[in-house]
Every structure is written in structure tokens, then in C-alpha cells.
């Protein structure tokens, strides 16, 4: 490979891929191009920065220069890729272009901001860069509105509350974590958030935001409004597919790849939050780690399919942490819920009484690995 491998992106997926390639080949040319600083940080830490009083710069684990030196890479930080010429195998930015033998898209996903009037007043916390842009406003805010009661919204609501802020969480759904589990399972965390002082506005809709002399006026449905100092959008992520689309690749929700992480173009692969693997978008650390291991082998000439086991998803709400696995969002499961003072075990079974999903909390999270072994893959 005279031109080697070019990777667009510098997040967890890109870094895992680099580490796995270098374990097998110390000299193949590797080039990383990304729009950010390329410094390494742990993205899940963003859910806890406010209660821990961390600044954006405190999150940096390794600088881009240290990373390049350690793994023998060419890095191009603060560089926007504008185009991919798939036929000529060339990646282009405004001032530069790179030939590749193999190209990997690790462009991640961007935070979805609801299209309401005043949406520009909403903050997002999907990267170190985004946190850096708003850390002073968030630190100074007394009253915070979080839009979205999913995994990230619930984590942030607890964190801001632990930092002593007045927190309101709004969601269209009737319960928190509604896309992940039924209300009878999420109710334990919901009660805990309420006990802590989080004001939950469920089955409610944000209609607009407006700057005022004393903060931001949030207009809700049913002629309601509240005034806050900061509004955070936590309404989910959208895979970054614009570059792939311009390159003529097949796109659905994400960049479509097969079990080999290969796109509709034989020399282009996708990995991480931007990828849709056989119809599934899996924006969690474990599938990305496993995907990176397989893709490294395939880029170096192997033909290894990705086989994902049953995997745990961790909800980082320290006052009431949860682990879940399996098809927790399935509507047809019967839930058997065992609740004790020290925690909960909720098992979702199908009509044949086969375990299909589970959620465990607090001290009973230690039962997760035993349950995981009994889930069908």
C-alpha cells in the first residue's frame, strides 16, 4: 500500500482502529484528518463534568502530537474534508488533498437540535469542543432546561442536579428512557430523579426559546412557559453522512456497511457512530471496540466478519446506575421485575419464556454478567 490508509475522524472509533492496526503493522502509512484538535478525551466523561467541576481542558488525556508520535501517524487537525473522489481515491480539503489505498470514515454523529424558534440558544454536549464553547455559561447557570429524557438527558439531569442547579427535564414521552425500556422498568430511576429535585415535564413539548433580560424564556405546549439560564439539547444523535453521500455511498440512517465494515465502495469503510452495520446503528463503546479490531484485520488483507455478542449498555447515573442488555425496547416482552432496597432486576421474556432482555440497577448490577450469558446472540 503505497498511499496507505486514510482515516477521517479522531474520536474513539478512529483511535481504536489506529491502535489495532499498529498492533499488527508498525509501518503501513496512516493518515488521520479531522475538524477538531485531535486531542484524546473520554467522551462519556461529558455526562459528569459539571458536578465534578471539570473544565474542557481537564478532559484531555493525550495531545494530538503525543498520539502521532506514539503510533507513527500523519495528523491533520482543524481540517475540514470537503469531498471524496471515490473513483480517483482522493480525499480533498480546501487547501490539501490525500491519495489513499483504503479510506475509513469515522466521522461520528452530531447532536440533533429540535427545529423550534430560538433553536440557536440551545447548547449541545456531544464533544470536548462543544463543552469548551459553553462551559462558562453552564457553570454560571442556576436554572437549566434539558430537552430529551433519553440516556444522555437522564445522565445530564442527574449531574446538573448533583451540582446544585435547578433542573427541568422535558420530553414528549410519558416516561424517561422511553426508547430503551418500558415505563415499569425506568420508573425506579425516574422516582430517584424526582426525589433529587429534578422537575420532570413528561408528555410535554418545547415550542420555542427567546432571550430575555434575565435568561431564556422557554415556551411549552398548553400555554406554559419557564425561564432558565441555559438549555441543553439531548434529543439524540444523527450519524454524520454528508461526506459519504457526496462520495456516492449507500446511506440509510448511517453509512451502510456489511459485516466486514465495508461500504458500497470496495475501498471505503465506515466505523463508529456514523456507521450502520447490517441495518443497525450502535453508538456504544463495546461494539465500536469490536468493530475496530475486525476492521484493522480487514484493512491489512484479512476477510474477518464482525460477530457481536450480547452486550451491556451502562447508564451513568451515579445515584442510581443501570446496566441493560438485549432487546429492551421490544414491545412484546413480558417483564418480571424484582425490586429490593439494594437494587432491581428486570427480566424481559418472550412468549416461549426465553430471556430476551434485562435491566439491573445499583448493587444488583453484579448479576448482569450471569444474565448476559443466557441471552441469545
From Swiss-Prot:
Family annotation (InterPro entries): FAD-bd_OxRdtase, FAD/NAD-bd_sf, FAD/NAD-binding_dom, NO_rdtase_NorW, Rbx-bd
GO CC entries: cytoplasm
Domain of life: Bacteria
Pathway: Nitrogen metabolism; nitric oxide reduction
Flavoprotein listed as a keyword: yes
Swiss-Prot/TrEMBL keywords: Cytoplasm, FAD, Flavoprotein, NAD, Oxidoreductase
Names of required cofactors: FAD
Catalytic activity of the protein: 2 reduced [nitric oxide reductase rubredoxin domain] + NAD(+) + H(+) = 2 oxidized [nitric oxide reductase rubredoxin domain] + NADH
Disulfide-linked positions: none
Subcellular location: Cytoplasm
Family the entry assigns: Belongs to the FAD-dependent oxidoreductase family.
Stated name of the protein: Nitric oxide reductase FlRd-NAD(+) reductase
Organism expressing this protein natively: Escherichia coli O157:H7
Gene designation: norW
Amino acid at each position: 500500500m503505497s498511499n496507505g490508509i486514510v482515516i477521517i475522524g479522531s474520536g474513539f472509533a478512529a483511535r481504536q482502529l489506529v491502535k489495532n492496526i499498529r498492533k499488527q503493522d508498525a509501518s503501513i502509512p496512516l493518515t488521520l484528518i479531522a475538524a477538531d484538535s485531535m486531542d484524546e478525551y473520554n467522551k462519556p466523561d461529558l455526562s459528569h463534568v459539571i458536578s465534578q467541576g471539570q473544565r474542557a481542558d481537564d478532559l484531555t488525556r493525550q495531545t494530538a502530537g503525543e498520539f502521532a508520535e506514539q503510533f507513527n501517524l500523519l495528523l491533520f487537525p482543524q481540517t475540514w474534508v470537503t469531498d471524496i473522489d471515490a473513483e480517483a481515491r482522493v480525499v480533498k480539503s480546501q487547501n490539501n488533498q490525500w491519495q489513499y489505498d483504503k479510506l475509513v470514515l469515522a466521522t461520528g454523529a452530531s447532536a440533533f437540535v429540535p427545529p423550534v424558534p430560538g433553536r440557536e440558544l440551545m447548547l449541545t454536549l456531544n464533544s470536548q469542543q462543544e463543552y469548551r464553547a459553553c462551559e462558562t455559561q453552564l457553570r454560571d447557570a442556576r436554572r437549566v432546561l434539558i430537552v430529551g429524557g433519553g440516556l444522555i438527558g437522564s445522565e445530564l439531569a442527574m449531574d446538573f442536579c448533583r451540582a446544585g442547579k435547578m433542573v427541568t427535564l422535558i420530553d414528549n414521552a410519558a416516561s424517561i428512557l422511553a426508547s430503551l425500556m418500558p415505563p415499569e422498568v425506568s420508573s425506579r430511576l425516574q422516582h430517584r430523579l424526582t426525589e433529587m429535585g429534578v422537575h420532570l415535564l413528561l408528555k410535554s413539548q418545547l415550542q420555542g426559546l427567546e432571550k430575555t433580560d434575565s435568561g431564556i424564556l422557554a415556551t411549552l405546549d398548553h400555554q406554559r412557559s419557564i425561564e432558565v439560564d441555559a438549555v441543553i439539547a439531548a434529543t439524540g444523535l444523527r450519524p454524520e453522512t454528508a461526506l459519504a453521500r457526496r462520495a456516492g455511498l449507500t446511506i440509510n440512517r448511517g453509512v451502510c456497511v456489511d459485516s466486514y465494515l465495508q461500504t458500497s465502495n470496495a475501498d471505503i469503510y465506515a466505523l463508529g457512530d456514523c456507521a450502520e452495520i447490517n441495518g443497525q446503528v450502535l453508538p456504544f463503546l463495546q461494539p465500536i471496540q469490536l468493530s475496530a479490531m475486525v476492521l484493522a484485520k480487514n484493512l491489512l488483507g484479512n476477510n474477518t466478519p464482525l460477530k457481536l455478542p450480547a452486550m451491556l449498555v451502562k447508564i451513568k447515573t451515579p445515584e442510581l446506575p443501570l446496566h441493560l442488555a438485549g432487546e429492551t425496547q421490544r414491545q412484546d416482552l413480558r417483564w418480571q421485575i424484582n425490586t429490593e432496597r439494594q437494587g432491581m432486576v428486570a427480566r424481559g421474556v418472550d412468549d416461549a419464556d426465553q430471556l430476551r432482555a434485562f435491566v439491573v440497577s445499583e448493587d444488583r448490577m453484579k448479576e448482569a454478567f450471569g444474565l448476559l450469558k443466557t441471552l441469545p446472540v
